[in-house]
């Protein structure tokens, strides 16, 4: 896939000035879109069912709440080497777990302790021994299994993305500020309808939005800025600077959309997002991943 030839790049060339179209194309990032597997297509990932776990790895539990639900698994070897801009393992499986509670018994928004307890990423290297399907603990109903294949796509930054704000926003504003927002710089499209129609068409063609790498697709504000708050909470200058620095290195590992086929509904058609620092991903330190979720 050549990002410069993607529908998102073409939308920039059509609705932006030549200078801004080039900036836009440089902001696009490759992502690995996960869609339902069809006959003859490779199995890349799956939702729900019984996860494949080594015998010596315990099912993740949130102390005081209970076992986490298995959400998804992704085969790192199925991503064409070097095609994503994040340092994924070249082999092995990544498994994602989430405590699917409600109210006060749920993973709380931007609460570091809740996120650490109620979400988990487990990496199973290809060399792991005694790997077998693991039944969910008694009383935990697994989500239905959905088999997924994958394809490389271009992904676009949202209006609150720090890089987009830096490229097209007010130079006097701080791109990393929580409330910074900028419109896409359309020309000859006064209300932006043509450009947004192109974005909407592309997104509709790639729904549900299960994705490895690339830009996150938010439901309600910047995913990366929210996740940074979960790592460095607080309103003081030290916390704000720590979040600003983190945004330079924080990347989305995976997003899992609501999906009726797997009986997954995160709030009101929401999404789950796992993020991680590039250096932690390269070091395979998945216990340092963070998380947020959004809903309409």
Write out the residue ranges for each language-model feature.
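C-terminal structured domains
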Residues: 267-296
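Hydrophobic, aromatic-enriched interface-forming segments
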Residues: 143-205
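Short, isolated positions within intrinsically disordered regulatory regions of eukaryotic proteins
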Residues: 28, 63-66, 100, 270, ...
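Hydrophobic, ordered structural segments
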Residues: 80-164, 280
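Short glycine/proline-enriched turns and hinge-like loops at secondary-structure junctions
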Residues: 87, 265-268
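An N-terminus-focused feature that recognizes amino-terminal "leader" regions
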Residues: 1-93, 175, 183-261, 286-296
